[in-house]
Each structure stands twice: as C-alpha cells, then as structure tokens.
A protein has these predicted regions:
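Nucleotide-activated donor-binding/catalytic signature segment of Leloir-type glycosyltransferases, i.e.
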Residues: 53-61, 537-565
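Conserved donor NDP-sugar-binding/catalytic core segment of glycosyltransferases
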Residues: 95-136
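A conserved acidic beta->alpha catalytic loop
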Residues: 37-48, 67, 535
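Short, acidic, metal-binding catalytic loop of nucleotide-sugar glycosyltransferases
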Residues: 21-30
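Membrane-proximal helix-turn-helix segments that form the acceptor-binding/catalytic region
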Residues: 406-445
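A recurrent flexible, glycine/aromatic-enriched loop bordering the glycosyltransferase active site
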Residues: 73, 124, 138-176
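Glycine-rich, basic loop-to-helix element that forms the pyrophosphate-binding segment
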Residues: 64-82
Length: 764
C-alpha cells in the first residue's frame, strides 16, 4: 500500500529542516513526502523550500499557499494532493521520526481493515506519551532515540490497542476512512480539535483509532502553527462537544484507567536495560517477609545506581518479580506454564531482564524447581545464609517438642526427628543435604550475616569458604499495615518488658504466652508489650489487667518512638530456636535498651561481645519459670548499677552500617566474572505477551459509537445559557475532579484560553 506523508508548515524553519531530514533518513518503501507551506511570513521557510527544490528528490512534493488558509484547510489541501490510492500520514513539522517508524505504522494498518487512524508512542503526545502519561516529556536534542525504538520493539506483541482519539502530531489515516467520512472539517479553522472530530466520526463509522506501540516519533513541541491555535480552543471545543457530547467522558475514563500503562512499563524496563550499562542482579527470597526481605530491600536501595536490581518472591510456580528502577518499582506476576522446564523459566526471565548474577537469599518457596534450574544455568549465582534451611527442612532446628536440637549432623538422629513431625516426615535428610551441597558447590560466593551462621554452614558443609558480612541497619522499613495509633500504657511504676517483631512458635510465641500467665499468677509488678503481633492474631490488643499489650504491625522507622511510648526498660527474646542475625536486636540497641537473649545463635554471640544485655543460661532458657526469675532479677532496682551499665553498652554498641554491608557485598559482585551475556544471548527471553500478562494488561474497549450531531459549517455563538452551553457542563465536571489524577492530566492537556473559559463559567 503506498503511503503519502503530509507535513503542514507555518514558520519554524529549524523544526521543518529537522523533520524533513529525519523522514529522509528513516523512511523507505513506496512513500511520498508532501510539504505544504501555509504562507509563512518567515523567509527562512522559503529558503528551506528552495534548498529542498534544488535537491530534486523524486519523493518530495513541495506546495505553497498564496494566502494563509489555517491548519485545517492546509492539511486538507495536502491530503488532497496525495495519490488517490495512498494511505496518509499527517505529520507535524516539529516532529522527528525514528528508524522503522513508517513500516511499523503500515504493519499496524495491515493487521485489521477496521483500523482507521493510528498514533505512535511519543515523548509528547498526551495519551500516547511516555515515559510519563499525559505529559510533555522533554527530550534533549543530544539524546539518541534509538534505545527507545529498540525498547518498544522488544516490548511489543504487538496488540494495537484502541484509543478514544488519535493525537494529531503524527496521525496515520487509512484511505478507506477518508473515502467514508471525508477529511478534516473546515469549521475548525486554524486548528485545535479537528483530529478529535475526525476520530470520533471514524468511530461512529465503525473504524478503530489505535496506538501503534512499536513505533516512536519524537514531538519536540515547536511553534508550527503559532499562538492563534490556543485562542481558538474555546470555540472549537464547543463545536467538538456539541457534535460528540460523549467525547470528554470517554477521554476522562481512558485517562483514569490508563490501560496502556503495562505497555509503557515493559518498554521502559527494556529501555533501562539498553540505556543503563550496569550489571543486572536477580535476588530471590521466599514470601514470608521478615528480616530477610528487609535486608534485601535495603541492599537494593543502597546500590541502585551501581546495579539494576530485580527481586523475585517465589511461591511454587508463582514468581512475583519486582524491578527496582529509579523512577518506579514495576511488579510482574509470572506463572510457570504447565510442563515448562524450570531451566527455561529461569533462563527466560534472565534473558528478558538482562540478568548477570543471581543472589539467592532463601529458596524455600520453590526449592526443587530452582535447584533444577540453577544446575543448568550459565549465570553465576551466590547465596546468603539467612536461615538454616540448607541443613534442615525445619529451617529452625526445632524438634517435635519445639526444642532446639543443638544442630545435630547425625543423619539417623535427624531422620528420627523429622519422622516425628508430620510436615517433614517424607523428607530424606541425606538427599536433602546432598542437593544443597551441590547447590553450594556451584555458588560463586557464600555470605553469612554472623560468625555463628558461618560456623553452622561450615559444620554441615566444611568444604565451602564463607564471608561474614553483618546486616547493616537501613533505618527502618515502611509497611502499609502498620498500626499508627499506639495503645495507652498505664503509668504505675511497673517495669515494662518488650518483645519485638512477628512472633510465631519458633520465635517463642507459646513461651511468651506462658511468661504473661506466670506474671499474673505471681502478681509481679511487671508488664509485657509485644511491639508486633502473634501467630494467633494480628490486631492490637490489651488485656483487662494491663499485664499484656500487643501493638500490632509497626513501621520499623517508628520503633524508637514506640519503645519510648510503651516505657520499655528491657527487650526480651523468648525464642525457641536460634537466630542468624536479628535486626530487632540492632533496633533495640539503637533505642538504648539492653536485651536478654537465649544462649544460642547470633543473639548470644552479639550480646556476649558487647555486654549490652544478658545471656540466659541453658537452664533458664529451657524453663519459662527460671527465665522469668532471671528477668525479674535483672530489673531489680537493687541491681540498678548493673542495669545502667548494660544500657550504656547498648547505646554505644558498634552497629553494622548499611554502607559497610553494601560496600562489602558490591565488592563481591564486582569480583565475579561476567559470562552471563553469552548465556542470555543463547536463551529464549520470556515473551512480551507473558510480560504484559504478568503486568495485568487489559486493553481498553471503546463504548458503542454514537452518530455525531449535525452542525452548520459556522460555529454558533455562545448563548450565555449554562443549561445549553456544553462548556458550562465541562466546567462543573472539571471542578469535581480537579484534584484527582485524571483532573490533573486533563488540566495539562487543555490550553490556557480554554481553562480561562471554563473558569468563567463556574458560579461565583
């Protein structure tokens, strides 16, 4: 199908030169370029035409009006000069086309004979703008557009989604549509609204207005038609709304829904990959939250300029992938297809997002599949020991009686222990450890957050070197479910002991309940507050006698204030199992509170090293009665000097910093070879269609088209009657939505003169 490109011109010779040269550089095939000057007073335009004429390019037709016709008639004359069998592209003179632009538009047109108009993506095209929707995204002249073109090509299925209207900066118009409904209506004069009217008439005639999501045309926002266009906005908007009263509602609904956001998100993801030459790191965790997730998010935030970070939260076949970019976090909900090999699933994700390194933090969410995939992956991976999962499926080393086993390595003892726990009875411990031995053997690095965690790893897998990098405190993490209003705490002089975090059985939930019960039975002058929640309930709660208060979920950035509010003197850890680090201990010390901890794991090591608290004896830890005795003794005012010394040590405890943790981890990343490029090139990227489905893409469907109202060629003068004035209706609607996202977007799209006219129609 031949295609003729019509460029209406009014002044702005520099824009015109740039536009023409871009068309000549990036357009091929059966096309003709029709450039029509609307009697521009600028002599530079005539000089530009003379230069073009001197080049004698057969594909260029130059036309000039003897008098100024206005944009609408000028565009119509240009379209009228097109070949009678050619589709037409109306192209503003302040645009710059890019590689493959016209081929992409032609493919779009060929995909469906019902397509009437086509608009490409642009930096400045209202509802077809990217990266920011409905905004003029400034594009410096020095910035290369090719990465964006490649990104759109990589992200395209294509789907060619419907639009409520095309955008006139670059509008492909099918010849059959011109034959069916005609050209732009001359009633729109010098311009504004003529393309919207055309698109609404196209829809009424059964044609589609669509977005071509694999084409990109820069719109650099020159002054092709001068300032008079804004002056005509009020008049032309009235004509448009009289003819198509549904127009504004459709556009408003479209902006509110923003249905092409997934298309933009995927394209921007690929643009980032092409334009940011930094390595990509894929972090993998389970979906249980807690300290592991806190650590990973802090590491990502602290090194986001040096690496492209992606976080997978894996739950079986469902992988939620977060892409952490400087402008936003994009979330993809991927599902492994039935029968799809795990190796293909992982390799496809790595190829799509340019992954150079996989950092495993916890694999309990998809163990078997991930082990299979990693065994065949050519992308280096490493492992941070956040729990004891590699050595025991219980993760916590707790037996059937919920007691710490002592990190037994004897397979016979472990088999008997697991057999007594229904959830793990079918696990063969020797096969379990062999799988993880193979995983660790291929790891490019192993990191432990504490010397204790490193020693446990060495106990089970002594052949592997481990680097100890303590977790740095990022200053807290926000959570949307945090309780914002703390419960009152009676001020009666009773000592308050706090437990911090989400407390399940392994963290000592049942032991805490028993400690509260014993406190009541003994009538102790003691209160317990859980800043967090129990596995049996998350809602804030306070017992009638005030002995136990449960705050609920908290924002860790507010923890110090909560500790002060609840008048906490001591932080207790009634844990049943060991910890590999404990962020809450760091937070307790940062608030100047000493801690009393079990005699196992990193808690015991950290308190022992600093003296910022007390380590329970084995007997005290094994018995809630003896544990409570020790807590009461610690809080006894007769031992105030000892307690105050622990407070001083807590306040002065040297805390691992986020900066040190990040620097040490980044040094490990950078020391690794980077052979992943070849592996990605050999792998089949997960398809754009699956990525869009993972972003929950749902194309917009236009409502049934209404036939346009018939108007005379001259617009009626304002009646002054608000009930009959469509702009009065628009003004009232705009007032209702002025502070919404949709309202702000519409405000950006409207010229100043139209906004002034709308404001004038509001009641005083």
């Amino acid at each position: 199908m031949p295609i003729d490109i019509v460029v209406p011109v009014y002044n702005a010779a520099d824009d015109l030169n740039r536009c023409i040269e871009s068309v000549l550089a990036h357009t091929s095939g059966d096309y003709r370029l029709i450039v029509i000057d609307d009697a521009s007073p600028d002599p530079a335009v005539r000089a530009c035409f003379a230069q073009l004429e001197a080049r004698r390019l057969p594909q260029i037709l130059l036309l000039a009006n003897e008098r100024n016709l206005g944009f609408t008639l000028n565009a119509n004359r240009g379209v009228g000069a097109a070949r009678p069998d050619a589709d037409v592209v109306l192209l503003n003179s302040d645009t710059v086309v890019t590689r493959g632009w016209l081929d992409a538009l032609a493919r779009c047109a060929a995909s469906d004979p019902a397509i009437g108009t086509i608009t490409p993506f642009s930096n400045n095209a209202e509802i077809c703008s990217l990266p920011r929707f409905c905004e003029n995204n400034r594009w410096p002249a020095s910035r290369d557009a090719e990465p964006m073109v490649q990104a759109l090509e990589r992200a395209a299925v294509p789907t060619y989604p419907d639009l409520p209207t095309g955008v006139g900066f670059c509008l492909y118009i099918r010849r059959a549509l011109i034959g069916a409904i005609g050209l732009f209506d001359p009633v729109f004069g010098l311009g504004y609204g003529e393309e919207n009217d055309l698109c609404m008439r196209a829809a009424a005639a059964g044609y589609r207005n669509v977005l071509c999501e694999d084409a990109f045309v820069l719109h650099l926002g020159g002054s092709s038609f001068g300032d008079k266009r804004a002056d005509l906005a009020e008049r032309n908007m009235r004509i448009l709304l009289d003819r198509h009263p549904q127009y504004l509602d459709q556009v408003r609904a479209y902006i509110t829904a923003d249905p092409v956001r997934p298309l933009r998100e995927l394209a921007l993801s690929q643009y980032r990959l092409l334009s940011e030459p930094v390595p990509g790191v894929l972090h993998m965790i389970h979906g249980h939250g807690g300290g592991t997730e806190y650590h990973v998010r802090a590491l990502i935030a602290a090194s986001c300029t040096a690496f492209r970070h992606y976080l997978v939260i894996a739950v079986g076949d469902e992988w939620q992938l977060e892409e952490h970019a400087s402008d936003a976090t994009r979330t993809y909900d991927f599902s492994r297809l039935p029968g799809e090999p795990w190796s293909d699933f992982l390799a496809g994700i790595c190829a799509r997002f340019g992954i150079d390194l996989i950092h495993l933090h916890n694999i309990s969410g998809c163990r078997d599949g991930l082990l299979q995939a990693l065994s065949s992956a050519e992308i280096p991976y490493g492992y941070t020991v956040h729990d004891l999962n590699f050595a025991c499926p219980t993760i916590t080393f707790l037996n059937a009686q919920h007691r710490y086993c002592g990190a037994v390595t004897d397979a016979a003892i472990c088999t008997a222990c697991l057999a007594a726990q229904p959830a793990f009875a079918a696990v063969g411990i020797e096969a379990w450890r062999e799988k993880h031995r193979a995983l660790l053997a291929q790891s490019a690095f192993l990191i432990a957050p504490s010397a204790w965690a490193a020693s446990i790893l060495a106990k089970y897998f002594p052949q592997h070197a481990v680097t100890v990098i303590p977790h740095g405190n990022a200053g807290g993490m926000s959570r949307p479910d945090a309780v914002r209003s703390p419960l009152p705490m009676p001020d009666d002089g009773r000592a308050v002991v706090a437990v911090l975090g989400a407390i399940g059985p392994d963290k000592g939930a049942r032991r805490l309940e028993r400690l509260v019960e014993l406190t009541r039975e003994r009538g102790l002058a003691l209160r317990w507050v859980l800043i967090g929640y129990l596995d049996r309930g998350r809602e804030p709660f306070q017992s009638a006698d005030g002995v136990f208060t449960m705050h609920g979920a908290y924002d860790s950035r507010a923890l110090r204030e909560l500790i002060e509010h609840y008048r906490v003197r001591l932080v207790a850890y009634p844990s049943a199992g060991p910890e590999t680090f404990s962020f809450t201990l760091s937070e307790a010390w940062a608030a100047g509170r000493p801690a009393i901890v079990p005699p196992i794991g990193a808690l015991a090591d950290r308190v022992g090293e600093t003296g910022a608290g007390w380590v329970l004896s084995d007997d005290e830890w094994s018995s809630e009665e003896l544990m409570l005795d020790r807590i009461v003794a610690v809080l006894d005012w007769s031992r105030a000097d000892e307690f105050n010394e622990a407070v001083t040590r807590a306040r002065s405890a040297v805390q691992p910093t986020l900066e040190a943790m990040t620097a040490a981890t980044v040094a490990i990343y950078r020391a690794l070879p980077q052979p992943a490029g070849k592996a990605r090139a050999a792998a089949q990227p997960i398809s754009a269609a699956r990525c869009l489905a993972a972003l929950h893409y749902a194309p917009w469907r236009p409502p049934p088209a209404a036939a346009p109202a018939q108007l005379p060629q001259q617009a009626a003068a304002p009646s002054g009657n608000a009930a009959r004035d469509p702009l009065a209706h628009v003004a009232r609607a705009a007032l209702r939505i002025r502070h919404t996202r949709t309202g702000r977007a519409l405000y950006r799209l409207a010229p100043a003169s139209l906004l002034a006219a709308l404001k004038a129609r509001l009641p005083r």
